[in-house]
């Protein structure tokens, strides 16, 4: 009888982690993720809390400084051994810094407002004697004169020319002697003329004054003024019937304009 013997097959080696190890790794992963998520709001809270603590500490220092300053003003500085002079100097420097900051803000605000607005245009010139005795009056930048902007110029000493269009208040005052020769009966006439950049000249305003029989110079003044729309390059000038009767000098005869 032949007996056969079969060798048992080797047992297969188990692969993979045990179930307990898998559970441990899962719990560890959940814990780490939870800790990471929870640390973010905690860090934000801690940062805000530190800022608040610093602010409270600063306020406390300010309160202590003010309290010490009050004690100095009450004459208790020598008793508490406080350096009152140093504290007063620090307080004065602080007040100066605050005042300077306010002034700088006001200046910046004013400059911004001025930048948004149109530049101010104004002119005022006084009469000047003309040896030619021309009917168009001569003007000069002397005495109490004004040339507020380079957008208005005095051309040829006779006319004010604007370089920007807009509404302008234009005025003139002419002072003259009202006495006349017996044969001359013409009134003294003052005319404010407009010379546009293109086109013919025209009268804006006109006024007249009758003569006087007095042989002495009786000073009289004619004032003309009105609001007109002037184009860029337009000019204004004054014409009189008898230039020899005009009285020149500061306060007597003048012409001016102001952009509204």
Curated annotation (Swiss-Prot):
Compartments it resides in: Cell membrane; Cell surface
A cellular component term, taken from the record's GO annotations: external side of plasma membrane
MF terms (GO), sorted A to Z: CD40 receptor binding; cytokine activity; integrin binding; protein serine/threonine kinase activator activity; tumor necrosis factor receptor binding
Parts of the chain that traverse the membrane: 23-43
Site feature (Cleavage) residues: 111-112
Glycan-bearing residues: 239
InterPro entries the UniProt entry points to: CD40L, TNF_CS, TNF_dom, Tumour_necrosis_fac-like_dom
Residue ranges of domain THD in the record: 121-260
Function comment: Cytokine that acts as a ligand to CD40/TNFRSF5. Costimulates T-cell proliferation and cytokine production. Its cross-linking on T-cells generates a costimulatory signal which enhances the production of IL4 and IL10 in conjunction with the TCR/CD3 ligation and CD28 costimulation. Induces the activation of NF-kappa-B. Induces the activation of kinases MAPK8 and PAK2 in T-cells. Mediates B-cell proliferation in the absence of co-stimulus as well as IgE production in the presence of IL4. Involved in immunoglobulin class switching.
Protein's UniProt name: CD40 ligand
Organism: Rattus norvegicus
């Amino acid at each position: 009888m032949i007996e056969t013997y079969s060798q048992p097959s080797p047992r297969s080696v188990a692969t993979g982690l045990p179930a307990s190890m898998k559970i441990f790794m899962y719990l560890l992963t959940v814990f780490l993720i939870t800790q990471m998520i929870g640390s973010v709001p905690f860090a934000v809270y801690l940062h805000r809390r530190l800022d608040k603590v610093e602010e409270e500490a600063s306020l406390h220092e300010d309160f202590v400084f003010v309290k010490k300053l009050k004690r100095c003003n009450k004459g208790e500085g020598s008793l508490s051994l406080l350096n009152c002079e140093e504290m007063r100097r620090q307080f004065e420097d602080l007040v100066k810094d605050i005042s300077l900051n306010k002034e700088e803000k006001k200046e910046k605000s004013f400059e911004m407002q001025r930048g948004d607005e149109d530049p101010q245009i104004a002119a005022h010139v006084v009469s000047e004697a003309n040896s030619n005795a021309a009917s168009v009056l001569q003007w000069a930048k002397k005495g109490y004169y004004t040339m507020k902007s380079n957008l208005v110029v005095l051309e040829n000493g006779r006319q004010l020319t604007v370089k920007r269009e807009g509404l302008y208040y234009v005025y003139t005052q002419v002072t003259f002697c009202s006495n006349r020769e017996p044969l001359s009966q013409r009134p003294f006439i003052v005319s404010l003329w407009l010379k546009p950049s293109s086109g013919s000249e025209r009268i804006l305003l006109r006024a007249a004054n009758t003569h006087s029989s007095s042989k002495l110079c009786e000073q009289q003044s004619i004032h003309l003024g009105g609001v007109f729309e002037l184009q860029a390059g337009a000019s204004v000038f004054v014409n009189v019937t008898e230039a020899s009767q005009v009285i020149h000098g500061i306060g007597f005869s003048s012409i001016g304009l102001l952009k509204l």
